[in-house]
Amino acid sequence: MKPPPNCTLITACYDLNKYNNKCRTTEECLALISPLLQLPVYLIIYGSKTTIPAIRMQRQIYNLDKITKYIQIEMEDLWTYQFLTKVKENRQKFWPTRDERTCAESHIICCNKFDFVLETIAMNPFNTTHFGWIDAYLGDGKNGLRICENYDSMIVPKILHELTKMPTPTNKFHIQVLNCNDKKFKDPQNKREFYERYRWVVCGGFFVTAPEAGTRILTRLKEIFVETTNQGFGHGEEMFYLEVLDEFYDDIHRSYGDYGQILNNFLNPTKNIEYVYHTIAENFKNAGYQQEYEDVCKKLQHSVDEYLIRRGAPAPL
């Protein structure tokens, strides 16, 4: 059998229904994670005593147990758990993006993904050169992933292979940009306004990184989580990337698009090009962010030149 791509993919599966009955049940979690468990990739799964046994059984059924590591760690032992009380206090005072499907505990799990990946980079049980994160509950109910059009089970392994293959494996942190945001929100004085509504910054549910770039960026994201939480804000992890996109500009490889085309566009723009141009490129141009605008243009032009999108598609060049 062909060996998996040289990348360890990481995810986490926790039952939060006991904290909030609007959160998914264990059964719902296991149904949504099923497509991910079928991927022939090195996989590390963090979870609890209520989720890991069933996940292990599914992975064994697919004969992928040998390339899987299960880490059973209860939520109370996670790095972010020390901030749970503060998160609850924050939400009592200021939570304009309130969503009954979430709770303080789900926020804690979500923001711990940075630490999950850093811990895995340090362990590196499969001795891979690269690492990636994928959210657990991306199943579409039809044995596919809802972050991809025309999904097939080889698209994730193909992405990981392309980013890690010799002789030119990536040395960057790869993530998809969702939109343009005003850089004034990097200023701590403007954080309250920033968090008055959900800002579309990046698609945080899937990223791939070389260890050096990833360690720097994920460590900084942990710092921003602490800073933002102590300031009284923070509802989800994607908005933490606003500072990181600038601070580590040359360490980040940006793909562009909406949530439904993350996998399609992760290597090059191929789907929903109207969104990439009108929602991302034009907004960068109108905001006066020239470098960001030119980078989107170059990616779109490359896709045209390589016949990945038709020449008549909306493009700024």
Regions found by a protein language model. Give the residues of each.
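Short, aromatic/basic amphipathic alpha-helical patches
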Residues: 53-65, 84-86, 245
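Short, acidic, metal-binding catalytic loop of nucleotide-sugar glycosyltransferases
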Residues: 27-42
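GT-A fold catalytic core of metal-dependent nucleotide-sugar glycosyltransferases
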Residues: 111-171
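Short, charged/polar "capping" segments at the starts of alpha-helices
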Residues: 49-56, 184
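Catalytic core and acceptor-binding pocket of nucleotide-sugar-dependent glycosyltransferases
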Residues: 140-144, 165-168, 173-183, 187-287, ...
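Short internal beta-strands
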Residues: 44-48
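Active-site-proximal specificity loops/subdomain of glycosyltransferases
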Residues: 63-124
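N-proximal low-complexity "stem/linker" segments adjacent to membrane-targeting elements
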Residues: 1-28
